[in-house]
Amino acid sequence: MINSPTVPPVIRRTFDRNMGAFLRPGDPTPPDNQRAIRPAQQVFSLGMEPLSQNHPMRDSAVAANWRFLMAATAGSGLYATVTSHDAPEFTGLARGAPAAIAVQADQDVRKLPAAQAENYNLSVLAIPGLLTEAFWLKWIGPDGKESDPARDLIVPFVTAQKQLMPMHPYTVEEFTRIAAPLAKKKLQSFKRLEEESQGRVKQQQAAAQEKRNAWRALARAPEPPRAQPV
């Protein structure tokens, strides 16, 4: 069974106070349609460096924001984002295909047999460097605590990586075995591009310096003698 997180009161107040200012005609309106609001999701962001080095996910992922999912009709969606800062900010609404995918995926993940076999706390894991978002199902032990990270599940629902299957539940070990090499390859590519960019900058600086030296040399050169009248 999947449990939705408890939203901190300050996050909820930020959502309630700012939501109306961002709505457009036709958007689902929370006060008028409470059924349109789905449980909120806490989003964690995972960087490429810790992922590539197989650092423990629970130690490396950083709390980024909260999402409040809403749906007016099947296939269309809307979600609001509130940051997880000490002073939370309402950063806006997502509409269209990305929102529809997020809303539908939230419904689908709850129906997965693997998710129903144990108790989990639901959150979202965003890996911007891999253009991937996944549900992070944190296993809950008999004591009611998230006590064994090895039993967590990762379920990608948006990804640009063909090696990852959307809506397939991976153990953390399985997911890391696939994603870590991808992150390492991306980092190497970023480093190569950075080195190439720095090389071009140095070439441009050297060319500019040569021009400056040429102008200085020209400025210091003595004037040629003037022709004497006959």
What does each model-identified segment do?
Residues 29-86, 130-143:
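Exposed beta-strand-loop-beta-strand "reactive/processing" segments of non-cytosolic proteins
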Residues 1-55, 96-120:
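Short, non-transmembrane alpha-helical segments in secretory-pathway proteins
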Residues 78-128, 145-228:
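A short, surface-exposed interaction/processing loop segment used at functional sites
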Residues 1, 67, 223-225:
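A composition-driven signal for long, intrinsically disordered, charge-rich low-complexity tracts
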